[in-house]
Amino acid sequence: MKTLNVELIVTPKTPKKIRKGVKLLLSALKITDAKPVYLSFTHRSDTYLNSFCFKNCEDEKKKTGCEIIYGWSLWEDKKLGFYEAEFHSVIKDNGDLIDITPRRKNEDSILFVADMSKTSGRKSVNSWYSWSNCKIVNGHVAEVSVELEIVQADGELSEFHTAHAIAGKK
C-alpha cells in the first residue's frame, strides 16, 4: 500500500457566524462560560507590532493600568472545514475589551473568546508562557492546545515568523 501525502493551503479568516466548527473549538478548549465577541483593532501606539499581543498588552498595562485578558482568536477556512483557536491577549479598559495588536492579515475584526482558565506571562526578557493553537478539521480535533514557551527572536518580525515553541511547564 502506498501513502499519499497531501498538503492543503489553508487561508483562515474571521468567522462571520458562530457555526458548528467554532462551537467545536469552544468545546475542545473546555470553554463553557464565555461567549465569543467581535473586536476591531484599536490603535494605541505606533510601537505595537502585529502578532506581539503579549508584549503590546504588557506595555499598555504599564502605561495605563488596564487589565490584560487572555483568550483565543478564532479562525476558519469554511471551504476546507478548518477551524483554529490561536491564544491571544487583549486589554480591558473601563469594562470594555479592546484589541490593541495590529493585524497580520488586515482583518476588520477578530472573533475573540476570553479563557479565564489559561494565562500567559513573561518567563524571561524575551519569552512568555503561552498555549499552542487548537485545530479542528472536518469536525475532528486535529491538534489540541498544550502549554508552551514563545521566544521573541527579532523585534522587527512577528512572532508568527520568529517564534519557536518548546513544550513544557511553568
What are these regions (language model features)?
Residues 1-170:
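A structural boundary/capping signal
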